[in-house]
A protein has these predicted regions:
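Selective transmembrane helix interface/packing segments
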Residues: 1-188
Length: 188
């Protein structure tokens, strides 16, 4: 909850008890995009790039799934609201302080899943054959990068909610602005 112009706002559409598992599983479906793009382009280099992309995405999904288990075991719930409320008392209750190794593993896996440096080998722009998007240009090429940036936002929100207190206010900064600042920090 946060207050905006005197009104208390609860920015929750639905509080499902397996919310974090649902978000991670929907994110894992994203590996079908590169696989189907490489297969449907009818190019052997795109198919090899798709196989490379799927193997990298699958390997880092395992790391991100296992690293998120430590905060889940501390909180005792998969609900994103419960994880947020667990860290609500002060900044020192954030799970980054009790689980720094899990945070680093999840951060590295998040960088790898979103193709950020140094894990941008899947469609590196300096290569002539740029992975599974070799045959795509224009709007289709742009849709892959819109999806990549949407994945960056979702990973940043997960990191902010699970490890950095979520929607809880930081001192004089209200909760809604605080989470946007945290997400912006991890995106840039």
């Amino acid at each position: 909850e946060f207050t905006l112009f005197g009104e208390t706002i609860r920015p929750i559409i639905s509080d499902i008890n397996v919310g974090l598992l649902f978000v991670l599983s929907v994110g894992a479906i994203g590996m079908y995009g590169p696989l189907l793009a490489g297969m449907s382009s009818n190019n052997k280099y795109s198919l090899l790039g798709a196989a490379r992309a799927v193997s990298q995405l699958l390997s880092f999904e395992v790391v991100s799934g296992l690293s998120i288990l430590a905060p889940i075991m501390i909180v005792g719930s998969l609900s994103l609201v419960d994880i947020n409320n667990y860290q609500g008392d002060s900044v020192f209750d954030w799970l980054i302080f009790s689980q720094p190794v899990a945070f680093l593993l999840f951060l590295i896996a998040g960088f790898a899943e979103t193709n950020r440096t140094p894990f941008d080998l899947l469609e590196h722009e300096a290569e002539i054959v740029s992975g599974y998007i070799t045959e795509y240009s224009g709007l289709k090429w742009g849709m892959f990068f819109i999806g990549e940036y949407a994945n960056m936002f979702s990973i940043s929100f997960i990191i902010s909610i699970v490890f950095f207190g979520g929607f809880n206010s930081i001192g004089f900064i209200p909760g809604g602005i605080a989470i946007l600042l945290k997400v912006a920090f991890f995106i840039f």
